[in-house]
């Protein structure tokens, strides 16, 4: 319903790995409410959306909001993987990088790959 493009598994893994690293040196928002606020306020650099969210309405607004605010976003297969990547013990439907810390180059590279998928 809300998945607008396919993301190869290796790119998902790269994105989750980046999210784990950013958690150490930068700033991450966890959960749909915090992610939505970060996008609306123009703070989000990259948004992660889990593909297995039920009910899908929880995150269905995020792709449109990201496109409206010109924020790149990526899908990951599992909310469990996303929860682990942001360092919480429970599943996470969505997350956002708001400060990439020392990983600007890695984030820029990933965002370029994502733009290639969206065409």
From Swiss-Prot:
GO molecular function, one term: structural constituent of ribosome
Compartment(s) of residence: Cytoplasm
GO BP terms, alphabetized: ribosome biogenesis; translation; tRNA 5'-leader removal
Any Pfam family: Ribosomal_L7Ae
Coiled-coil zones: none
Primary localisation category: cytoplasm
InterPro entries: eL8/uL1-like, Ribosomal_eL30-like_sf, Ribosomal_eL8-like_CS, Ribosomal_eL8/eL30/eS12/Gad45, Ribosomal_eL8/Nhp2, Ribosomal_eL8_arc
Keywords of this entry: Cytoplasm, Ribonucleoprotein, Ribosomal protein, RNA-binding, rRNA-binding, tRNA processing
Family named by the database record: Belongs to the eukaryotic ribosomal protein eL8 family.
Assembly and binders: Part of the 50S ribosomal subunit. Probably part of the RNase P complex.
Role description: Multifunctional RNA-binding protein that recognizes the K-turn motif in ribosomal RNA, the RNA component of RNase P, box H/ACA, box C/D and box C'/D' sRNAs.
Protein known as: Large ribosomal subunit protein eL8
């Amino acid at each position: 319903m809300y998945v607008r493009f396919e993301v190869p598994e290796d790119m998902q893994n790269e994105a989750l790995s980046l999210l784990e690293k950013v958690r150490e040196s930068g700033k991450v928002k966890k959960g749909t409410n915090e992610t939505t606020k970060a996008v609306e306020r123009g703070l989000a650099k990259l948004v992660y959306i889990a593909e297995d969210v039920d009910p899908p309405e929880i995150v269905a607004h995020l792709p449109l909001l990201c496109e409206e605010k010109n924020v790149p976003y990526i899908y990951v297969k599992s909310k469990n993987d996303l929860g682990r990547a942001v360092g919480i013990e429970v599943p996470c439907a969505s997350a956002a990088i708001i400060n990439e810390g020392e990983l600007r180059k890695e984030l820029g590279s990933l965002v370029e790959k994502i733009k290639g998928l969206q065409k």
